[in-house]
Amino acid sequence: MTESNEVLFGIASHFALEGAVTGIEPYGDGHINTTYLVTTDGPRYILQQMNTSIFPDTVNLMRNVELVTSTLKAQGKETLDIVPTTSGATWAEIDGGAWRVYKFIEHTVSYNLVPNPDVFREAGSAFGDFQNFLSEFDASQLTETIAHFHDTPHRFEDFKPALAADKLGRAAACQPEIDFYLSHADQYAVVMDGLRDGSIPLRVTHNDTKLNNILMDATTGKARAIIDLDTIMPGSMLFDFGD
């Protein structure tokens, strides 16, 4: 057993796993969190070190995930299942790192590219179901873990000085796109203004509606679960459809 495995086995021991751990290995191709597959003599699990540089508010991030997943489970919807620590918490701070464990969802696949129209259709249906099952959830309970994530006016204000500086000299190569963007500046506040005045309802938003954030059943091809819930926040469902 290598030292790194010894460390990982020690971290896994902080969680209420069923069965003795027999192996831990890197898993997936995500770029944000560091993910491992934990094998036991019983169920399998996903062990993750959360990226606190991108998500410094671990407490509220995990609170968001717990609120949404518990709501989905109460309606019989398959979703990520948080495995508590041995002390009953949803995550653990270990040697300066923020760690959590999910139950591994067996017999599923995910895709980085759409292999056929059926998968594309199922992906759209899956995110539609996600919105539908959470339509009665009070999204004001959720915390904004990444400030101004889909706040277009705020991003536009950031864009203007970056365009003026043009530090890498690339603006000329995309001038038609820039002109198009600038010509629609009067529309950028529509959604945010609607959220503020209540004309657009506040809803749970996933904010990262990529194909590979859906687990499909390996046999039927049907969507089983929406994953990568770290960007769940309050917002407009238009954010997710826009993505």
Residue ranges and their predicted role:
Residues 216-243:
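Active-site Asp-x-Gly
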Residues 18, 25-29, 48-59, 105-121, ...:
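ATP-dependent phospho-/nucleotidyl transfer catalytic cores
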Residues 1-25:
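Juxta-kinase regulatory segment immediately upstream of eukaryotic protein kinase catalytic domains
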Residues 43-141:
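ATP-binding pocket architecture of kinase catalytic cores
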Residues 33-39:
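ATP phosphate-binding glycine-rich loop
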Residues 25, 36, 81-83:
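Conserved beta-strand elements flanking the ATP-binding pocket of the protein kinase catalytic core
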Residues 39-44, 221-222:
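Active-site beta-strand-loop-beta-strand hairpin of nuclease catalytic cores
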